[in-house]
């Protein structure tokens, strides 16, 4: 009984013990004032991507594993749509299609420039992809990923309506 009281005092539980005289079983009823460890995992958490809304999105670095954008690590290919950063489901430049870029068509206000980073080298895109972007009034810059990151940072610093679709360069390509 002393152990139960000690445990309850540590976890800030108020107790009302009811014991029957015929048995050694006690019913413990109480109210918790603080969360237990297992309740911490059920809570929703929010990561603040940037402290100020006007600061803009900046790509600080890239690696074969992903990117450091506004101090946050993003693994794998990503779509940078200020102020959001999303995983982009492509494996290489050959996977870039009209469907894989459909996310960029839905943005309001419409982006002016889409910067595509194709990995270690500048790669050619399928003609229908370029035609679709032109038809929708979106200028496209296809570059190797290091230059695409720099171009996006420049456009972002000028407050242009730009987005980036980036594929990390493979290991050993720097």
UniProtKB/Swiss-Prot annotation:
InterPro entries: MTH938-like_sf, NDUF3, NDUFAF3/AAMDC. SUPFAM superfamilies: MTH938-like. It is found in: Nucleus; Mitochondrion inner membrane. PANTHER family: NADH DEHYDROGENASE [UBIQUINONE] 1 ALPHA SUBCOMPLEX ASSEMBLY FACTOR 3, NUCLEAR PROTEIN E3-3. Belongs to the NDUFAF3 family. It comes from Danio rerio (Zebrafish). This is NADH dehydrogenase [ubiquinone] 1 alpha subcomplex assembly factor 3. The keyword Membrane applies. The gene is ndufaf3. The lineage of its organism: Eukaryota, Metazoa, Chordata, Craniata, Vertebrata. One of its GO terms (cellular component) is nucleus.
């Amino acid at each position: 009984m002393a152990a139960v009281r000690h445990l309850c005092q540590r976890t800030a539980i108020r107790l009302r013990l009811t014991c029957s005289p015929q048995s050694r079983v006690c019913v413990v009823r109480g109210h918790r004032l603080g969360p237990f460890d297992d309740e911490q995992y059920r809570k929703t958490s929010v990561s603040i991507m940037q402290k100020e809304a006007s600061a803009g999105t900046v790509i600080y670095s890239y690696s074969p594993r992903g990117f450091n954008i506004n101090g946050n690590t993003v693994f794998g290919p990503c779509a940078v749509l200020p102020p959001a950063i999303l995983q982009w489901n492509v494996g290489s430049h050959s996977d870039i299609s009209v469907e894989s870029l459909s996310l960029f068509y839905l943005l309001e206000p419409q982006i002016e420039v889409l910067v595509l980073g194709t990995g270690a080298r500048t790669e050619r895109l399928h003609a229908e992809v370029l035609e679709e972007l032109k038809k929708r009034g979106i200028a496209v810059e296809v570059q190797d990923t290091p230059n695409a990151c720099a171009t996006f940072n420049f456009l972002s610093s000028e407050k242009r309506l730009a987005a980036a679709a980036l594929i990390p360069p493979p290991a050993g390509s720097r």
